[in-house]
Amino acid sequence: MNLQELLAKVPLLLSYPTIILSSNLIVPSHNDLISRAASTSAAEYADEKLIFFSTDHAIRLIFLPTFVASSFNLFAHYFNFINYSSRRKYYVLFTAIYFLSILTAIFHPIQSTCITLLIIKLLTTADESSPKIALNFKTILKTFVPFITLTLVILRWDPSFDASSGDVNKISTSLAAYALLILTLRYASPLILSTLSSSIGVVSKDTSVAQHSISRNKRFPLILVLPIFSFVLLYLMTIVNKTYNIQLLMVFVFFGCLSIFFLSLKDLFTEDGNQKKGGQEDEYCRMFDIKYMISYLWLTRFTILLTGIMAIVVHFLSFNEITSSIKTDLLSLLFVVVAEYVSSFSNKQPDSHSHNHAHHHSHLTDSLPLENESMFKQMALNKDTRSIFSFLLLNTAFMFVQLLYSFRSKSLGLLSDSLHMALDCTSLLLGLIAGVLTKKPASDKFPFGLNYLGTLAGFTNGVLLLGIVCGIFVEAIERIFNPIHLHATNELLVVATLGLLVNLVGLFAFDHGAHDHGGTDNENMKGIFLHILADTLGSVGVVISTLLIKLTHWPIFDPIASLLIGSLILLSALPLLKSTSANILLRLDDKKHNLVKSALNQISTTPGITGYTTPRFWPTESGSSGHSHAHTHSHAENHSHEHHHDQKNGSQEHPSLVGYIHVQYVDGENSTIIKKRVEKIFENVSIKAWVQVEPQNSTCWCRATSMNTISANPNSLPLQPIAN
């Protein structure tokens, strides 16, 4: 696995267990509901007990799984990950996700994460030609007996387990769920495998884009209506039974993590498909096998282990505990390790695959025709933005993990930090979009290209950093005078440490993916880098201040660390703001200013030239002025000059300045020769100029009195006509 594949897979490790947990928390947990019902009087509880449990089962076994499964299919369709070419495919996948959602409601979230991943691994590595042999009873039992044993031991060793109070039903429910799972894998696997063998929803070049769009629009109402309808039913159930309430914030986290999950998968698969283009036919490379992509790209070695560990961390952050005791905590960790060990036996990597999937590892180059691709593919495949795009997905996934913890813990500080991360993700996205757009060629609508978007993005990031610093200073000063004692320092330390690791990955990704191209692109990358650096410094400050507070119990360390971090960010952001604002205002530095003055002095001393007007020059980037430009100007003498700048020498391919100038010549001189002399002067100093030559007594707009008296400062550019 190369570095880029690792960066693309990390968001999957975070988003998948968060999807499992947040889907279970859309409605209050079963234990919370029992405690609420038990808090009422004994008579009321006895009367409502039957209604309560029947409603609870209806929500957890019907309405909530329907909402989760339909939402999953909706996002898969929206991100063009699965092409629902038939309703049968939609119904099969909906039923599979529905069943997995029921399992997540029965088992512990950590167990659900490992079991569902193992099921997906079994299905994607099974032989489609003989699924009954690949998934026979012996194989399935051999796979799930260790998990059945561990689940029963965890339930029995739970300190809250009480056989007399009906906790035995938990054991019977778990056994029934495993039995149903084994039977489903045994008898429904052929249908599921035939569905998984279908291609992903990426249209080949031979397929009509119009027909594909029409077919998507015809099926989209069916896919969209079911999530809305199931959510409305869930909401109506909360109205009927006041014990329930829908956690809208958890719905937001669930949808956000689904988006990150599919974007990360698409990112991972897009790179693999791009690598194959060099060695195989393009038509084949546009069609991917879902089974291959999942088993060979996503669920590779140690993926289940790492995802299970992430599930443990996410559960700890949400509930401040893994399970109810140390023994069951260790058993849960053993459950994750066993899941990885069992999955290694199903990870059969045959030498001869039915589709001959050759995995080519090659570096992405700029030679790929990305101009006509979607914005997503351009960010995902461009070598300068790919690593940063993968970090953006990782940062967004961690933001949703923080949001989940802040909702559960009611922590306003962590919620504020999550919103800060959302602002950072927005800044990263703006910077990446600007980096892609600046590489677009010039056009009739944008004759100078979009290169200055990089400068604008850098300036925007600088302003956002300035706002963040102001917010940090205000909050820190307030906490100096009104100290806030931190209590949940352990959880805060875990979150800050994870945030530090994520940001260190971001710095590493930036160093790996971004290169110094100079100019506006460099300013854009500098703005992105400063945002990542600001987050890293913030995480370092939180870790250090939290450790000092734990040791000394002095809350003053928190605002002091914030002031130091804010000062460092400010010192880094001010130079970025200064340079980008100067470029936006088209300001010339001293070196370029002297370059223009030297060229103008040469023009003023050229024989046959009486003067010049309106010299306008500004910094530019390579490729920004390659568009053919026609400058037509009519005078009383009816002179018309067209000039196309397609010079091939090195000085004009990468000019440092671009602009235009009007030059007046002596009557009787050849205008073509005069223009070529002026062009040669500018070419020698790497300035790309549009030159308009005109007779000395012409009535051009540039000869107006106001233009002739622009400046009388001898240190400024000589704007007035030069007299003979």
Swiss-Prot record:
Keywords of the record: Endoplasmic reticulum, Ion transport, Membrane, Nucleus, Transmembrane, Transmembrane helix, Transport, Zinc, Zinc transport
Q: Which GO terms describe its cellular component?
A: cytoplasmic vesicle; endoplasmic reticulum; endoplasmic reticulum membrane; Golgi apparatus; nuclear membrane
Q: SUPFAM superfamilies under this entry? A: Cation efflux protein transmembrane domain-like
Biased region (Basic and acidic residues) positions are 634-648
* Topological domain ranges for the Lumenal compartment: 28-58, 112-134, 196-219, 266-298, 408-417, 475-491, 550-563
Q: Which PANTHER family match?
A: PTHR45755, ZINC TRANSPORTER 7
Q: Know the name of this protein? A: Probable zinc transporter MSC2
**What is the species of this protein?**
Saccharomyces cerevisiae (strain ATCC 204508 / S288c)
